[in-house]
């Protein structure tokens, strides 16, 4: 397929720049083949049944953006992509001139780091303070909002750009389908007999990288680290045994689960995945998908087209634009039925 096959018109006014006034006060578009239902997110429990299993991504967004200057002069900005150990990290670095190995960077006027070496488009940084990287980010980092949110991070984002169940540090972007859930909604689902389980996939900045090839099959996917607990594998098996459906909350949960089942049976464990899901892919684990609306020509739009059907998704997106749904990270949600 061609990249142009995944384009659509989106008025800029529909890109949500702020979260809704209250967490969960979003709309929900249910896509069941060509049948569309306009709902509120509060209606989600009515679309699930006892015995179903919701699988959430419990990654936590780190304050990954650091501002500073090179020891030799000139401003520098670093986006920490992956923490390697207590004192080293891979980062995207923006500066008037790329730092050379051995050069020093000083962030927030207090944290010195050495540029060790280059890794493709990223830089390996070694922080020289006694504090570990996570402590440095917590003290001086800024939350890395997506590039289409055209404002700086505000105090409110510290809470609203995290899910209520986030616990495993390491993401530089939120698993946004989960942002709609409140503690009250989770309690309602539990009382209804709907089970929950967790995976971890640390969302990287690559999730926002544009596809630069015309032939989609030639795209090289970014890689991300994931972890599937044995308890989640067991919960999925139990849901299958009782006739329940596996409902992935977000495309990141899909990528983690489908990666862990790439060779057939779903297996627990930690790994790195560059799985690229496009129309024609056969889903092994996920039965239903809760997700937000995705960017034109993006790999995530390709994933949902593979899941719910290309024609079905593009009809749903045209409907969403017409009905003025809110798009992207702070926008509204969709509940997708798998096309079989």
Swiss-Prot record:
GO annotation terms (biological process): queuosine biosynthetic process; tRNA wobble guanine modification
GO cellular component, one term: cytoplasm
Top-level lineage group: Bacteria
Molecular function terms from GO: S-adenosylmethionine:tRNA ribosyltransferase-isomerase activity
Pathway: tRNA modification; tRNA-queuosine biosynthesis
Keywords: Cytoplasm, Queuosine biosynthesis, S-adenosyl-L-methionine, Transferase
InterPro entries according to UniProt: QueA, QueA_dom1, QueA_dom2, QueA_sf
Entry keyword Transferase: yes
Keyword S-adenosyl-L-methionine: yes
Subunit structure: Monomer.
Family under the similarity heading: Belongs to the QueA family.
Function: Transfers and isomerizes the ribose moiety from AdoMet to the 7-aminomethyl group of 7-deazaguanine (preQ1-tRNA) to give epoxyqueuosine (oQ-tRNA).
Protein name: S-adenosylmethionine:tRNA ribosyltransferase-isomerase
Source species: Chromobacterium violaceum (strain ATCC 12472 / DSM 30191 / JCM 1249 / CCUG 213 / NBRC 12614 / NCIMB 9131 / NCTC 9757 / MK)
